Amino acid sequence: VCTPIAGKLTPVPRTATFERPVSGGDALLSIGSLLIGAIAVVAAVVLLVGVFDLNWVLGYAIPLATAVFAVALWQSLSRRGWTWKDLQLTSGPRSLWHLLWEVPVAWIAAMSVGIALAGAVDIAPASDAGGSASTLDALDVGVVAGTLTIACTVLIAPVLEEVLFRRVIFGWFDTRTRWQIAVLGSAVCFGAVHVLPAIALIMVCIGSAAALLVRLHRSLIPGIALHTMNNALATAAVVASI
């Protein structure tokens, strides 16, 4: 965007969402941490399935993946010189009290659009939405596995995924293009990791809503709040179905 000054066009500086810009190296190493977590789970299942019962191994899959992902993500960012402050887990210029109505409205709107789009292209949500099979496996194994899985799904995973998809990937797009494109780009990446077409489409909408809230507040907290609410409702639905 340019404005005329003294007969010349000069670029108008954009207001970045985050204080610290994201480099290509930051993004690549952070994405690599997610892959490391996935590989660790596959390797653990292959190695342990002959030693322990398959249901027991699958019951601890989410806690294992979350732990490996957390360590790998933090190591990748800390090696790049990132600190807790750089994650911007603080309130921005807009009061966080607005989240009391913004998060529910954003979730309802995102889910409505996502389900409508899934219906329009004739792909129905699968029964394993939000990793429900893994949650049920954990609950079948016992209280410890079930509690760890629910805690990871509802509390820990949303923080880690928001750091990756909103702080890093959205931040990378945001420093290179318009914020609207950054919202869509990070949301598509977020949806892609959910694999199943219907779930991926809905997660694109959830990711877009989270990115919009992050952009509005200039803080990662709104994205975490929306992500936590989504996972909590999905987990509650799974537990209620038992």
Predicted segments, located by residue:
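N-terminal, membrane-interfacial amphipathic/helix-forming hydrophobic leader that caps
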Residues: 1-115, 119-123, 232-242
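Flexible, active-site-adjacent loop/turn segments at secondary-structure boundaries
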Residues: 85-87, 134, 188
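Transmembrane helix-loop-helix hairpins at the membrane interface
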Residues: 108-112, 138-242
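Glycine-centered loop/turn motif at secondary-structure junctions
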Residues: 122-125, 177
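Short, structured loop/turn "capping" segments at alpha-beta junctions
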Residues: 124-131, 163-166
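Perimembrane loop-to-helix junctions flanking transmembrane segments
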Residues: 130-140
